[in-house]
């Protein structure tokens, strides 16, 4: 199998994973940056830590590293349009994306998206280069949770809502 064919098959296989849609934000001395639904996952709960992967060629990396902190905003099913803006699917500029309503400052001063299912603010503890991406290990310092809304995932290169079953009260 050719290397290019293997890469394409790998990408197609990864499109079968269904991660939650996240918007990663940072704002401090090095500037402001927003990264659309990047893969992130829990590493450990002691200390609470996650990993975030960003393409090594992204112009946002110096901003994330310079600020040393970020926020992972887990979008709810009603925030698909916002996810499309941040993914560059609508032609909206980066400055305009931050100009959208719904942002507030979190405990660490990071942009927290109102209505997100969860917002996890943390400090970047390590950055490693693995292939074409930088892997950020982030120690979580502040967590905001919402009891409202359903999930939003990205599966087979499309957004999909994930609805919770509701208990029926007799």
Curated annotation (Swiss-Prot):
Keywords: Aromatic hydrocarbons catabolism, Flavoprotein, FMN, NAD, Oxidoreductase. The keyword Hydrolase does not apply. Its EC number is 1.5.1.36. Pathway: Aromatic compound metabolism; 4-hydroxyphenylacetate degradation; pyruvate and succinate semialdehyde from 4-hydroxyphenylacetate: step 1/7. It catalyses: a reduced flavin + NAD(+) = an oxidized flavin + NADH + 2 H(+). InterPro entries: Flavin_Rdtase-like_dom, HPA_mOase_red, NADH-dep_flavin_reductase, Split_barrel_FMN-bd. GO terms for molecular function: flavin reductase (NADH) activity; FMN binding; NAD binding; oxidoreductase activity, acting on NAD(P)H; riboflavin reductase (NADPH) activity. It is an enzyme of class 1 (oxidoreductase). It comes from the Bacteria. The keyword NAD applies. Induction: By 3- or 4-hydroxyphenylacetic acid. One of its GO terms (biological process) is pyrimidine nucleobase catabolic process. Homodimer. 4-HPA 3-monooxygenase consists of a reductase component HpaC and an oxygenase component HpaB. Belongs to the non-flavoprotein flavin reductase family. HpaC subfamily. Catalyzes the reduction of free flavins (FMN, FAD and riboflavin) by NADH. Subsequently, the reduced flavins diffuse to the large HpaB component or to other electron acceptors such as cytochrome c and Fe(3+) ion. This is 4-hydroxyphenylacetate 3-monooxygenase reductase component.
